Curated annotation (Swiss-Prot):
One of its GO terms (cellular component) is ribonucleoprotein complex. InterPro entries: Ribosomal_uS8 (IPR000630), Ribosomal_uS8_CS (IPR047863), Ribosomal_uS8_sf (IPR035987). It comes from the Eukaryota. Keywords: Ribonucleoprotein, Ribosomal protein. One of its GO terms (molecular function) is structural constituent of ribosome. One of its GO terms (biological process) is translation. Belongs to the universal ribosomal protein uS8 family. This is Small ribosomal subunit protein uS8. The gene is RPS22. It comes from Kluyveromyces lactis (strain ATCC 8585 / CBS 2359 / DSM 70799 / NBRC 1267 / NRRL Y-1140 / WM37).
Amino acid sequence: MTRTSVLADALNAINNAEKTGKRQVLIRPSSKVIIKFLQVMQKHGYIGEFEYIDDHRSGKIVVQLNGRLNKCGVISPRFNVKIADVEKWTANLLPARQFGYVILTTSAGIMDHEEAHRKHVSGKILGFVY
């Protein structure tokens, strides 16, 4: 079976491990987008440390879970989002105001919707985490 989205597989593995109460999860293959997405999640405290393991193939990532994650997911296709429309997307995707983050890929890098609003940049929507 072919993989349609490496990021979707990674976030699905994290969700499943979190639901079953695991303390860590192995993600393979890895990509730069997954690493940046995990950095945003780590910055907001949804996951603990994560380590990239180079196996001379596609690489692996070991993520330490801390039990704070409720759900994370990918939005496919990656819709273009203007700064004014971010509020509509947060209302649709997140369970409540001031709770969780919509993660965007912008010209200034991968960041959450609040940082994108501060930097006044728009981009494509990658996913959400809460």
